[in-house]
Amino acid sequence: PLSGVYLSYEMLQSMDQVTAAVEALEDGSAVMLDLKSIYGSYYYTSSLEGASAPQDWDTQAVDALITELRRKSCYLIARLPAFSDNAFALAHQSEGLPLSNGALWMDAEGSYWLNPASETVQTHLKDLCSELQRKGFREIVFYNFYFPESANISYSSDLSRREVATAA
């Protein structure tokens, strides 16, 4: 039988709820954790440049949870957004998806998106994956991992949409 649990951002806000879920797990179970928001906040202690936690967030509790899950030999899976990241987009505006007026494109959730074809963005994601691997995560599930469709996005004039999509 398969055994596992998904610890969402909402669950991570209540460590009592998380503790109950983890105690019920058999050793070696799969556990997927939300570890970053679309706004660029990290839910664990990250050493990446510009990484910060949400206000009033206990990253040490999440770090301790990861340690406990590793002690139980759990199969750790990280879940995080790939290209929607306000903090990175604002810190590296040239790596965001621009509108024709130069402002950054924002999705319906109020999140700025990064250019999936950008080498800087791809390196950032690789660094994030490497950090999570060092913390014991065996898989990473990216969401918001696509080129957004919007007539308002002004892709570089020297690249067509097809070329941009092929580059990623």
Kindly give the residue locations of the regions a language model identified.
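Glycine-rich, aromatic-flanked loop segments that form ligand/cofactor-binding clefts
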Residues: 30-35, 58-106
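Structural preference for beta-strand elements that scaffold enzyme active sites
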Residues: 2-6, 30-32, 73-77, 138-141
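Acidic-and-aromatic substrate-binding clefts and catalytic sites of carbohydrate-active enzymes
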Residues: 8-17, 38-39, 55-56, 85
